[in-house]
């Protein structure tokens, strides 16, 4: 009888722990961890109250404009870089992910490879830049940059070559992970 009671308690605890997932580092539709697409720049102090916020500002004729906001954990680990838009009520437009704990709902993050991206997400398009390849997803606001040095040598030079998903090696590492909110 005691065994059944202990078993029931342990099972209940396991179910409770399993259901209590931490979303502080999940990238979902209109959300990056604690940050929501609807948050304004003024909300940043509240959203990241337990973290360090560093604002990179520029002085203009009409006042001070925030160019970039860096978010650090209290221990000094760089989490995010936020770039606001220039609206009258500025919101976040671009987020650069620095911390590998941030992953998409399907588990793709900075420590993932191109194989992880193509296996877990639908690729919308691939844009070739001078030194990088940018991969946009259909099902997420996140996009990934892979350095051309990860590609075969015949694709590394020149930006006029359109690169397709089949040409990118499965083991290609992610250089940057970004989220774009327009």
Where are these regions (language model features)?
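Bacterial Sec-dependent N-terminal signal peptides
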Residues: 1-26
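Short helix/turn-capping signatures at newly exposed starts of structured segments
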Residues: 19-130, 139-140, 158-182
């Amino acid at each position: 009888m005691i065994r059944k009671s202990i078993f029931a308690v342990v099972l209940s605890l396991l179910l409770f722990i399993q259901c209590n997932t931490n979303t502080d580092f999940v990238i979902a539709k209109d959300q990056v961890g604690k940050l929501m697409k609807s948050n304004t720049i003024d909300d940043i102090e509240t959203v990241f109250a337990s973290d360090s916020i560093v604002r990179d500002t520029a002085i203009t004729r009409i006042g001070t404009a925030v160019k970039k906001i860096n978010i650090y954990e209290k221990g000094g680990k760089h989490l995010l870089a936020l770039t606001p838009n220039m609206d009258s009520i500025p919101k976040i437009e671009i987020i650069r992910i620095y911390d590998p704990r941030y992953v998409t709902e399907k588990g793709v993050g900075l420590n993932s490879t191109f194989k992880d991206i193509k296996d877990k997400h639908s690729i919308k398009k691939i844009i070739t830049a001078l030194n990088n390849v940018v991969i946009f997803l259909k099902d997420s606001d996140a996009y990934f940059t892979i350095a051309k040095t990860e590609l075969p040598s015949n694709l590394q030079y020149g930006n006029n070559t359109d690169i397709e998903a089949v040409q990118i090696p499965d083991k290609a590492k992610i250089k940057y992970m970004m989220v774009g909110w327009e």
